[in-house]
């Protein structure tokens, strides 16, 4: 649960009034600058949002007649309002301080400029209030691509991750991956605090990757881009040998590219994952080897077909 108190501590803000409301829960990622409300229009006032007051809002407020000021601020401070933040180290109006105390609305000041603070708060709130889920798998950063390795228990996910780490790649999470959907089509994965930096190898036990391989072998969090699903090789199953079949894995409301890799003795899965990551990077740059091969093949078939027709005409 995200509260106003945690926001104050995170951004080192200064409390002015309304300390009794510090445990209010923040539920909305949106932030408002109540310009219309300062003018007296409260019909669509989003009172459940954090309110930012900067130079523009307070300059207009100072132009209001004395008899309107107190009522305006009492309407601004609602029981459901998580916080009102005055930026640029400006002096909060006395009427606002009184209203904040009356309605137990946290009144906070910040030295940061309004636009800059809004940007930082939005990023923070989207991250903290994002939808979350957990998946069984291993998350590794391979050539800058967040690769989620999944498969049945005992298939060799952790062993593959260990080989990737030895080859210079970085571990994010093993066994349990916490995933946040911080925005549309953007998933961020990390390890639970309890198992951070740890890797379980059957027959060996739990190892601390950072202790063994150094700080450069681990990463706190990584954006998920590619899913490598490991499964035992089935003779009767037809596997994609060209790369034209597009599979996806849906996590929350976001889909990421999925590649199914059959596992059997003699296959170096770590190298295959490295190549898959590099090939994914080429694909997002607009280079698709499978499609280029398919185009060349179709052109060759068409050319041979035309040559055959010309021979028949002769």
Curated annotation (Swiss-Prot):
InterPro entries: HPr(Ser)_kin/Pase (IPR003755), Hpr_kin/Pase_C (IPR011104), Hpr_kin/Pase_Hpr_N (IPR011126), P-loop_NTPase (IPR027417), Ser_kin/Pase_Hpr-like_N_sf (IPR028979). It catalyses: [HPr protein]-L-serine + ATP = [HPr protein]-O-phospho-L-serine + ADP + H(+); [HPr protein]-O-phospho-L-serine + phosphate + H(+) = [HPr protein]-L-serine + diphosphate. Keywords: ATP-binding, Carbohydrate metabolism, Kinase, Magnesium, Metal-binding, Multifunctional enzyme, Nucleotide-binding, Serine/threonine-protein kinase, Transferase. The active site is at 136, 157, 175 (proton acceptor), 241. Residues 262-267 are annotated as: Important for the catalytic mechanism of dephosphorylation. Induction: Constitutively expressed, with or without glucose in the growth medium. Its cofactor is Mg(2+). Residues 199-208 are annotated as: Important for the catalytic mechanism of both phosphorylation and dephosphorylation. Kinase activity is activated by fructose 1,6-bisphosphate (FBP) only at low concentrations of enzyme or at high ATP concentrations. GO terms for molecular function: ATP binding; magnesium ion binding; phosphorelay sensor kinase activity; protein serine/threonine kinase activity; protein serine/threonine/tyrosine kinase activity. HAMAP family: HPr_kinase (MF_01249). Catalyzes the ATP- as well as the pyrophosphate-dependent phosphorylation of 'Ser-46' in HPr, a phosphocarrier protein of the phosphoenolpyruvate-dependent sugar phosphotransferase system (PTS). HprK/P also catalyzes the pyrophosphate-producing, inorganic phosphate-dependent dephosphorylation (phosphorolysis) of seryl-phosphorylated HPr (P-Ser-HPr). Belongs to the HPrK/P family. Homohexamer, arranged as bilayered trimers. PANTHER family: HPR KINASE_PHOSPHORYLASE (PTHR30305:SF1), PROTEIN YJDM-RELATED (PTHR30305). This is HPr kinase/phosphorylase. It comes from Staphylococcus xylosus. The lineage of its organism: Bacteria, Bacillati, Bacillota, Bacilli, Bacillales. The gene is hprK.
């Amino acid at each position: 649960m995200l509260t106003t108190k945690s926001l104050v501590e995170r951004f080192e803000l200064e409390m002015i009034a309304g300390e009794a409301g510090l445990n209010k829960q923040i539920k909305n990622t949106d932030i408002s600058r109540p310009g219309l409300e300062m003018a007296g229009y409260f019909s669509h006032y989003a009172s459940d949002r954090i309110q930012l007051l900067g130079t523009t809002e307070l300059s207009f407020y100072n132009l209001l007649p004395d008899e309107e000021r107190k009522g305006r601020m009492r309407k601004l401070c609602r029981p459901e309002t998580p916080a009102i933040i005055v930026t640029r180290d400006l002096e909060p109006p006395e009427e606002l301080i009184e209203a904040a105390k009356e309605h137990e609305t946290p009144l906070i000041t910040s030295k940061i400029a309004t636009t800059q603070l809004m940007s930082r708060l939005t990023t923070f709130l989207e991250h903290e209030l994002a939808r979350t889920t957990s998946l069984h798998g291993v998350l590794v950063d391979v050539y800058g691509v967040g690769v989620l390795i999944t498969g049945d228990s005992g298939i060799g996910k952790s062993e593959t991750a260990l080989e990737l780490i030895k080859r210079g790649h970085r571990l994010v999470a093993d066994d349990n991956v916490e995933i946040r959907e911080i925005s549309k089509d953007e998933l961020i994965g990390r390890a639970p605090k309890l198992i951070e930096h740890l890797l379980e190898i059957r027959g060996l036990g739990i190892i601390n990757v950072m202790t063994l391989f150094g700080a450069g072998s681990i990463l706190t969090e990584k954006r998920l881009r590619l899913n490598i699903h490991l499964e035992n090789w089935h003779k009767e199953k037809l596997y994609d040998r060209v790369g034209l079949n597009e599979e996806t894995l849906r996590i929350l409301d976001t889909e990421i590219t999925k590649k199914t890799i059959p596992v059997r003795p003699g296959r170096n899965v770590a190298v295959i994952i490295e190549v898959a990551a590099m090939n994914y990077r080429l694909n997002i740059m607009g280079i698709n080897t499978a499609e280029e091969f398919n185009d060349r093949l179709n052109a060759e078939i068409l050319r041979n077909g035309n040559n055959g027709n010309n021979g028949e005409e002769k």
